[in-house]
């Protein structure tokens, strides 16, 4: 009772407006914003020598957003440790996630994906209408990832860098087994009940009772099993254990112990707050992902060199070898990153990709949600049904994906071109859709219909 009374009397409000970004020191006393601009336009001239004025305007726009949102140092910090990696022969991935939509990142060699050629949108990464920390997901050779982290620790000080805690939560089956053990129920009986829970991603006990007749019957036939499931439902989703995040590293302007509580986890120092809380507190979180596929690529290139053959340059390779596409279309993709699962191989044999765009679309389709589009996409791609569009304005947006909405960028382009949204506002719609915010989507549905009518498009579309 006293604890509750004290809690009710406390009115502390955390002020999280401050960003704890570490400072970057540009050489020769140059202002950081000027140095970032210099690096970007040097890369722009090198990578896009034939670019038109609209491309330069986009880079100018991105730089103004980066500066106005206070993320100049962030871009320079990321550029610096990626530059270190590349100078020291550490293979770095070409870029993944929303960061690949930044032309500035492409010009800085943070990513190797041309966002203009691939129709990627900067506002999905950095939105002036939604103030949040940017987040580059960066892959490094698995065996040399630690060298990059060590460089960051050395540059910014070990008291300013820490790894991040993560909490494993009780999934449905695990909750049943743990509760059964606590209730001293026979293991065989508990295991039998646990196996009645469908082994699907994000399965909950509530949903399992709905879709598993066997589990539902057991629940309604036995008071012991009902007690087991009811207790398990209360524990489901609760933290079960703590571990160190596989890739996350936080870098702070101030000594990190002054900003968040720390703990020792094996040999590393980790934060006691998880990633989401750290971002809310304005701390810089980086994902240093160790990817074994990059290590295999490194070893392959080394082997080619030792064999006396010319080593291919990854940044100038063409993606148009028909023999490679024939191999992929046969489902012969063991060990190929993101194409090696049994389900994906089966899908590739149906899809029969003959371009790099087909592979990108295939990876995007083969996940919950877009999977519903697979039959239509495959039929249209292989000429078994015509490609149709609800409105002519959808054709340039959906042409490359045979009339199917596959990418989140396409959602943003649709609400912009048909509903009159800005790209920044269209990102808010994309985000609400991905987070399943039904109230926001209901409101935006009406806004979109009204925008359609203003653009001369029937609201029913």
Which residues fall in each region the model found?
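Alpha-helical scaffold/interaction cores of sigma-54-like transcription cofactors
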Residues: 1-461
């Amino acid at each position: 009772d006293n604890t509750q009374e004290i809690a009710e009397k406390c009115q502390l409000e955390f002020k999280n407006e401050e960003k704890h970004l570490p400072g970057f020191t540009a050489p020769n006393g140059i202002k950081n914003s000027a140095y970032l601009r210099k690096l970007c336009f040097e890369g722009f001239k090198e990578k896009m020598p034939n670019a038109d004025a609209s491309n330069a305007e986009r880079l100018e726009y991105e730089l103004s957003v980066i500066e106005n949102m206070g993320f100049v140092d962030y871009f320079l910090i990321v550029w610096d440790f990626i530059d270190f990696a590349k100078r020291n022969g550490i293979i770095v991935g070409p870029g993944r996630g929303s960061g690949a939509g930044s032309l500035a990142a492409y010009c800085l060699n943070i990513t190797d994906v041309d966002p203009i050629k691939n129709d990627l949108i900067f506002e999905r990464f950095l939105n002036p209408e939604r103030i949040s920390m940017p987040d580059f997901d960066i892959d490094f050779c698995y065996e040399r990832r630690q060298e990059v982290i060590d460089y960051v620790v050395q540059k910014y000080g070990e008291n300013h860098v820490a790894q991040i805690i993560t909490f494993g939560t009780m999934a449905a089956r695990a909750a049943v087994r743990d509760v059964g053990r606590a209730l001293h129920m026979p293991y065989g009986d508990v295991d039998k009940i646990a196996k009645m829970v469908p082994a699907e991603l994000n399965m909950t006990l509530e949903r399992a009772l709905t879709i598993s007749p066997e589990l539902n019957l057991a629940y309604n036939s036995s008071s012991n099993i009902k007690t087991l499931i009811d207790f398990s439902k209360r524990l489901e989703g609760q933290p079960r254990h703590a571990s160190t995040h596989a890739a996350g590293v936080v870098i702070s302007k101030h000594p990190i112990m002054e900003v968040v509580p720390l703990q020792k986890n094996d040999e590393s120092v980790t934060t006691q707050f998880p990633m989401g809380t750290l971002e809310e507190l304005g701390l810089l979180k980086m994902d240093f992902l160790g990817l074994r596929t990059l290590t295999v690529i490194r070893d392959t290139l080394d082997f080619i060199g030792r064999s006396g053959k010319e080593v291919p340059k990854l940044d100038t390779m063409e993606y148009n070898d028909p023999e490679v596409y024939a191999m992929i279309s046969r489902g012969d993709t063991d060990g190929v990153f993101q194409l090696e699962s049994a389900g994906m191989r089966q899908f590739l044999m149906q899809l029969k990709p003959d371009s790099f765009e087909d592979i990108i679309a295939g990876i995007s389709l083969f996940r919950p949600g877009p999977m519903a589009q697979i039959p239509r996409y495959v039929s249209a791609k292989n000429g078994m049904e015509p490609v149709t569009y609800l409105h002519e304005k959808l054709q340039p947006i959906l042409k490359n994906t045979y009339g199917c909405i596959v990418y989140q960028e396409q959602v943003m382009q649709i609400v912009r071109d048909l509903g009159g949204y800005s790209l920044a506002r269209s990102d808010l719609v994309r985000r609400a859709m991905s987070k399943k915010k039904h109230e926001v989507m209901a409101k935006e549905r009406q806004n979109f219909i009204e925008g359609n009518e203003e653009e001369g498009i029937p609201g029913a579309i």
